[in-house]
Amino acid sequence: LPLAGISLAFTEYRGVKAPEFVGLDNFVRMFEAPGFWTAFLNTLKLSVVKLLLNTLMAVVISLLLNEIKNMAFKKTTQTIIYLPHFMSWVVTVSVFSLILSPSQDGLVNTLLVNAGILEQGQEIYFMGSKDWWTSIFYIINVWKDTGWGTIIFLATLSGISPELYEAATMDG
C-alpha cells in the first residue's frame, strides 16, 4: 500500500476512472499553495516542541520513579502514568473538552468562577481560543504520550547496576 500511495502522488486521481500521470505537477501546486508554508512551519513547530516536552517529562518522571523504593507504590504510579497511552485520541479529546468546556459542566471554568478569578458569563472557551489552543495541545499531548517514554527511560535506568551508583558515590 505505501507504494500505491507514492505512485498516486504522481497522478491525477479521478475516482473510478484510470488515474492520469501528471509527474511533479501535484507537488508544484502544493508548494505554491498560499497557506502551505504557514501550515508546514506550524506543524514543524508543534512537532518539535511536543517532542522536547514529552522527552523532558519522560526523563524527569523516570528519574523520580527510579528513586522510589516501595515497589507497590512504584508499580501503581507507573500504571497510572502509562494508562493514558492506551486511550484513543477521540476519548482523550472528548474528556478534555468536557473538563475545559465553557458551560456549567466544565470543571476548569467552574473552579475559576467559584474561586472568583472569572465572573459568571466570562468563561474561557479553551479549546476554541487561539490564545489557549497551543497550550492545551501541548498539555493533552504530554499527558497522553509521556507514559510511553517514561517506561522506556525507566527500563534503561533499571538496567544500570547498583555497583555503578556505589562507585560514583565513592568517586564523588
Tell where the protein language model's regions lie, with residue ranges.
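A structural signal for multi-pass alpha-helical bundles of membrane permease subunits
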Residues: 1-171
